[in-house]
Design a protein with these regions (language model features):
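Ligand-binding cleft/hinge of the Venus flytrap
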Residues: 49-60, 101, 125-127, 136-158, ...
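Alpha-to-beta junction loops
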Residues: 60-61, 77-86, 129, 168-181
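Extracytoplasmic small-molecule ligand-binding "clamshell" domains
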Residues: 21-91, 95, 247-251
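A ligand-binding cleft/hinge motif common to bilobed small-molecule-binding domains
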Residues: 74, 87-95, 174-196, 203-206
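Acidic, polar ligand-binding/catalytic clefts
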Residues: 52, 65-125, 136-139, 202-205
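Periplasmic-binding protein-like
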Residues: 30-32, 105-109, 192-229, 253-261
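Ligand-binding clefts/hinges and TM-proximal coupling segments of bilobed small-molecule sensing domains
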Residues: 138-152, 194, 229-265
């Protein structure tokens, strides 16, 4: 090998080593919330994919840790994670976290059986009904305030699957859930026959925005958030942001079906 080729080879190796060193790792705590966040879906779900790409364009390699939602919050708040995703804004969370620019627009609706002639315009229209709900879950301050008036009863369980099972058994009348999350749970856990029994009311219970939260306990969070927000604004401006959700509607984040095992007989 000539000295010139050796020199060029060393320069290339040095360049690649520098790029690898600059690829910093970000650890982000998340909860399971398919199709937005799920260890079982392609790219860990559409929001995980979006977050990964946003940070990759800023030179970071993102690693997600799926935890129960309360642990995802508390572990990030103490600085064990660089960020946590995704969360509704609540004033009390500002003590622990910086909030990014809005990352996800959600639409919460009431799921119900098609056999139920259900209509609503005001919360009082729900009086006397039994609702399903998620553990420690907020459906927005206005509906939370209505629930506190005890005009309806709400039976909270840990998963969407459990809530839909109760709905099918008529143990609850309504189940408030984010629309894409609800239909993803139905597709994943229920037969086509059971899916066909359930619909949602078109009037949204809540149109909500969710955010990436970065812990105030970490000194670098404000600078990291500024870079994230700038890149997110670029994605929205160029239309790239919308392509992730177009892919979601086309089923591109669904897990690959497991092929049947071949028999030796």
């Amino acid at each position: 090998m000539t000295p010139r080729r050796l020199y060029l080879g060393l320069c290339l190796l040095l360049c690649l080593s520098t790029q690898a060193a600059e690829q910093k790792v970000l650890n982000i705590s998340v909860g399971d919330w398919p199709p937005y966040l799920s260890a079982d879906m392609k790219h860990n779900g559409v929001i995980a994919h979006l977050i990964s790409d946003l940070f990759a364009d800023e030179g970071y390699d993102v690693r997600f840790q799926f935890l129960p939602w309360p642990r995802a919050y508390s572990a990030a708040a103490t600085g064990r994670f660089d960020a946590t995703a995704v969360w509704m804004h609540k004033a009390e969370r500002e003590a622990d976290f910086h909030f990014s620019a809005p990352l996800l627009d959600e639409q919460f609706v009431f799921f119900h059986l098609k056999t139920l002639p259900f209509d609503w315009h005001h919360f009082d229209d729900l009086t006397g009904m039994t609702l399903g709900g998620g553990l420690e879950y907020s459906y927005g301050p206005q509906f939370d305030e209505f629930l506190a008036q005890n005009k309806v009863s709400i039976e909270r369980v840990s998963t969407a699957m459990q809530n839909f099972e109760k709905l099918l058994k008529e143990r609850v009348v309504l189940y408030p859930q984010e629309m894409n999350v609800g239909y993803a749970a139905l597709r994943s856990h229920f037969s086509e026959e059971d899916q066909a029994k359930i619909t949602h009311h078109p009037t949204p219970l809540l149109i909500n925005r969710s955010y990436l939260m970065l812990p105030k306990s970490l000194e670098g969070s404000p600078a990291l958030m500024a870079r994230f927000n700038k890149r997110l604004a670029d994605y929205r401006k160029t239309g790239r942001y919308d392509r992730y959700f177009a892919d979601l509607q086309q089923g591109k984040y669904q897990p690959e079906p497991i092929p049947p095992m071949e028999s030796d007989y």
